[in-house]
Amino acid sequence: MTPSLLALLLLGAFVLHDGEETLMMQRWQQRHSADIMRRFPRLKHRLSHLASITTRGFAIAAAEEFVIIAAAAIMLFLGVPYAFYIVSALFIAFVVHQAIHLVQALILRSYVPGLLTNILLLPATITGLVYIIQTLTATQIAVCSAAGIVVMMVNLPFAHYIGRKLSQ
């Protein structure tokens, strides 16, 4: 594994995973949101906001996220200082995102959009994560993890906002 391969792995994994989410989310929401809101009433606000995003809106939201990952990869390919840390932070955030899907599937005891690619990509994401762990210090991993999660927490609502606006 090299930093460039890690960036390519992240790009490819993201395209596959978000492709599955984009293709499946709207139909899955229509079939399952009422049951989930009944079982988990505290999630009603979150689910109702996601239900208003069309497949086109999800695709646009995923494209916005892809631009961020692609920009980090390009920076790495061009040799921009610290770009490996940015790619590592985004890779770790992607792994956290995958873990969230696995937890959702376990809680719901059913398929959730993104689960299939999570399972198929597990060997590749573990390989990438092992590379990061072997390459960075514990402090660097902690900083990259925190930064990646913050970027994910800030950008995801923004991406969903764009998706909702362009779904109307």
Predicted segments, located by residue:
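Helix-coil boundary and interhelical linker segments in multi-pass alpha-helical membrane proteins
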Residues: 1-11, 72-86, 127-143
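N-terminal signal-anchor transmembrane alpha helix
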Residues: 1-27
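Transmembrane alpha-helical segments that form the membrane-embedded catalytic/substrate-channel core
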Residues: 15-23, 94-105, 151-165
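Cytosolic, membrane-interface loops and tails of multi-pass inner-membrane proteins
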Residues: 22-51, 165-168
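Core segments of transmembrane alpha-helices
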Residues: 56-76, 120-126
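Hydrophobic alpha-helical membrane segments
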Residues: 92-101, 112-132
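Non-cytosolic membrane-interface motifs at loop->transmembrane helix junctions
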Residues: 106-120, 139-147
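Terminal transmembrane helical module of multi-pass membrane proteins
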Residues: 125-168
